[in-house]
């Protein structure tokens, strides 16, 4: 692994490779430690070995504002299994050691960052091999203290482009973000029940005009056709969270079935890119 392949470098290398192949990225989300730290690592292995181009990982948190019941369930299972922030950083370091070129992003809430001290949190994230951090409850307008700490530690700050954002917000997201842009397919909480269906072409063309980092479409991405549609509309790929976590919830007591089902789902979603 070259010394230069850090933070945004891993995203750039991944997007460049996919572009050369004429493909998009499939990026699954899971909560670290769900349903247990040990099984969590096997789940991540299964995702990567079956075609995940990058990972989006959450730290368990007991009051996730933006998350629907599926991801809240993941948070509670992980906490019940005793997963602490320290355990999360240890898991991240193991994943990084196994997959030196894989982009690894964190998606979490400001409280978890504050609890560590902002600078200390990003320092730990860097040591664990994290490439990017998205703080779900901090809008771009209020993000300066986090972004400055992120950049000081070579970590890409990720921002959400909401479906109802005006041009001013999209310009700010484009200028402030690194690595990739998290494009919401609809406002609200995460989940598979209301399918992603917002026409995103307009936002995608604006993001392109503002030279934003590559946009990944998230929220409600649960089936291969949605991945294909996102990429066709101009996204660099798609993020799927609740659909992945739902598989973990359903098969949490049957490890073999869980990993097999997750492998099949990941292969099908990746094939759609």
From Swiss-Prot:
Function text: The alpha subunit is responsible for the aldol cleavage of indoleglycerol phosphate to indole and glyceraldehyde 3-phosphate.
Name under which the protein is recorded: Tryptophan synthase alpha chain
Gene3D superfamilies from the UniProt entry: Aldolase class I
The reaction(s) this protein catalyses: (1S,2R)-1-C-(indol-3-yl)glycerol 3-phosphate + L-serine = D-glyceraldehyde 3-phosphate + L-tryptophan + H2O
Origin: domain of life: Bacteria
Pathway note: Amino-acid biosynthesis; L-tryptophan biosynthesis; L-tryptophan from chorismate: step 5/5
Family under the similarity heading: Belongs to the TrpA family.
Disulfide bonds: none
Subunit structure as annotated in this protein's UniProt entry: Tetramer of two alpha and two beta chains.
Enzyme class label: lyase
Organism of origin: Shewanella baltica (strain OS185)
EC number: 4.2.1.20
């Amino acid at each position: 692994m070259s010394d230069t392949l850090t933070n945004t470098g891993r995203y750039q290398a991944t997007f460049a490779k996919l572009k050369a192949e004429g493909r998009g990225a499939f990026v699954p989300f899971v909560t670290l430690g769900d349903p247990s730290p040990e099984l969590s690592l096997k789940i991540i292995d299964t995702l990567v070995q079956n075609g995940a181009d990058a990972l989006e990982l959450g730290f368990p948190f007991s009051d996730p504002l933006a998350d629907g019941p599926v991801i809240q369930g993941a948070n509670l299972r992980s906490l019940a299994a005793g997963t602490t922030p320290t355990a999360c950083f240890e898991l991240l370091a193991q994943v990084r050691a196994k997959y030196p070129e894989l982009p690894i992003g964190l998606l979490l809430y400001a409280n978890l960052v504050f609890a560590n001290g902002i600078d200390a949190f990003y320092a730990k994230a860097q040591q664990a091999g994290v490439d990017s951090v998205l703080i779900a409850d901090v809008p771009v307008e209020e993000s300066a203290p986090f972004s400055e700490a992120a950049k000081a530690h070579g970590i890409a700050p990720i921002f959400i482009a909401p479906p109802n954002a005006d041009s001013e917000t999209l310009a700010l997201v484009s200028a402030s973000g690194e690595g990739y842009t998290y494009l919401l397919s609809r406002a609200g909480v995460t989940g598979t029940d209301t399918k992603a269906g917002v026409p995103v072409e307009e936002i995608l063309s604006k993001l392109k005009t503002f030279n934003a980092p590559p946009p990944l479409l998230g929220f409600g991405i649960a089936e291969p056709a949605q991945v294909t549609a996102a990429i066709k509309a101009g996204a660099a790929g798609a993020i799927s969270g609740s659909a992945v976590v739902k598989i973990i919830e359903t098969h949490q007591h049957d490890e073999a079935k869980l990993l097999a089902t997750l492998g099949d789902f990941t292969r099908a979603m990746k094939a759609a890119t």
